[in-house]
Amino acid sequence: MGILKKENEKSAKPKYNMWQCSAYMISLAWREKEKKILLLCLLQVFLAVMSNLVNLYVAPSVLSVVERGASITELLTMVLIFVILIMFCSAATSYVNSNTLYGRVTVRLALISDINKKACTTSYPNLFEEKFTKLSAKCQQATSNNQEATEAIWDTLTSLAQNCIGFVIYLFLLVSVDIWLMLVILLTSLIGYFVNKKLTGYGYRHREEEGGISRKLWYQIRQAQNYTAAKDIRIFGMKPWMEEITDKAMTAYTAFHRRAHNVYIWGSILDLVLTILRNGLAYFVLIDLVLSGNLSVSAFLLYFSAVGGFTAWVTGILGSMTTLYRQSLDISIIREFLEYPEPFRFQDGEKLSDATGTQHEIKLENVFFKYPGADDYTLEDINLTIHPGEKVAVVGLNGAGKTTLVKLICGFFDPTHGKVLLDGKDIREFNRQDYYAMFSAVFQNFSLLAETVAVNVAQSEENYDMERIKDCAEKSGLTAKISSLKDGYQTYLNRTVYEDGAELSGGETQKLMLARALYKKAPFIILDEPTAALDPIAEADMYSKYNEMTKGCASVYISHRLASTRFCDRILLIGNHKIVEEGTHEELLKLSGEYARLFEIQSKYYREEDVCEKGQETAHLA
């Protein structure tokens, strides 16, 4: 089955053909109000054809004047006319070409924006789909520079149009010579085109393989340049190991493109053979006409040039079609990515504001969950209700499923079996963006914007409440640090982007994330190990303010430190993929179960550590 699936993927046709992809790019230019791209392309076509015709007729026309024995004045006039025409075409072409770049870049950037929007707003489970991640990597490659399909397609369409017009003009010019000659030229050209089309489809048929190789390579390159990995690379001597892995990825990448090149080269060889046959036959016919006295010298020169030009037009059409086909493969992939199915409901979901009041209750009913592609369940038979304003703590060993439970509550995943209900209604019925708006969170992995402190707290560049930002910073314990910064709340973060940007420590960043979570004022607040990077004093300060910080909202607090959960209304202990114990801190201790055992182990550790510190202090005083 695996082999059959792989073969089907290789032979799969692109979802959109090259004409649909071309129409898509034109509509995108129209949407972005870059209609001048089309006008400039038409001007390029007109000037290219005009320039070619001028160059075609210049030598035969001058020779014809000489053959007729015309005056020197007529000859010079003829030469001057052609010089002016050539200069005009050259100058106009340069002017038009210099004005085409901006609009094309704008359209490509708009496409990049669409791709980024899809990546940022897609249903969370899609991020774990291999097909989605491969399409995403291909989209990044297809929009990475000016030579990629999303921008180069305009040159291809322009080239195709001018080649088609030139072909028609030259066809009428040469049809009087020999109709069979024209048919032979067309036939050999079509054979070359269809064979080339089949060969150049190799890249698309093997796009899954190429996508996987590219993702590995670019991951290694990004990791080598990753600021956060710099310390690990140096301390653990990872440089040789990373170089070895990168070399393997580059070798695989090079090998793939070498195989593709070996396929493409056969198309080039066939083109060469067919071109020799076409030109040889055409020149034989023309020379025979001259020798039989049916063509003048100037006419021979015209047709001789026209045959070469006609062949160039035909080759140009086929080359442009082949290039357009190859570029359309990338654009088709981009469209597939943008249209990737969404398991969650967004715009078509029920508006949350219309369905619920201000007080909310979340309930998990018989929830089972396993990650995409996994065989075993991470969580089994979870039944949980979070009441309005309730403070719930979730504890358990590493890998117990605490963070997974939070992902289900937040709606990042839907249960494999069972339901997550908001105020008694399945969250799958709601607009998922509206549902996300119900939550504020501090996750284990967080990200800072290369923006000011104020913008990072408010998550908005405009219309933010400065007093509320300061209040949230005070509650999270970040006020002193912000006061020490050069521009206070207007200080930019991230030294990679801003030379004078501030760099926060892990604990300071965690406080900033807490301030951001408080600023949102959501009905539910999720705190996943919010004190992991804090020192004991800052941690104790956060505990003392917890009730104040979470006033008016329900909260879910995840922690490994069992002593830190005393201020919660209810504690859930996750173990063996289930909720094994539930109650207040005191109730769970009285049960003398797993929670009490873990608490005793942690308490013993802290007592021993305290005794050790006191012993060292006594020895120091002695």
Model-flagged regions — what are they?
Residues 410:
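Helix-to-loop junction immediately C-terminal to a conserved catalytic motif
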Residues 419-421, 436, 454-499, 543-544, ...:
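ABC ATPase nucleotide-binding domain helical subdomain, centered on the C-loop/LSGGQ "ABC signature"
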Residues 1-23, 105-151, 213-256, 328-341, ...:
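Extended non-transmembrane interhelical loops and adjacent amphipathic helices
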Residues 3, 488, 544, 552, ...:
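C-terminal portion of ABC ATPase nucleotide-binding domains
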Residues 136, 377, 415, 421, ...:
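ABC-fold ATPase nucleotide-binding domain signature/coupling loops
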Residues 1-51, 72-77, 96, 100, ...:
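Membrane-integrated ABC transporters
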Residues 38-92, 172-203, 277-284, 288-298, ...:
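Transmembrane helix-loop-helix hairpins at lipid-water interfaces of multipass membrane proteins
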Residues 238, 282, 303-339:
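Cytosolic ends of transmembrane helices, especially the final helix of ABC transmembrane type-1 domains
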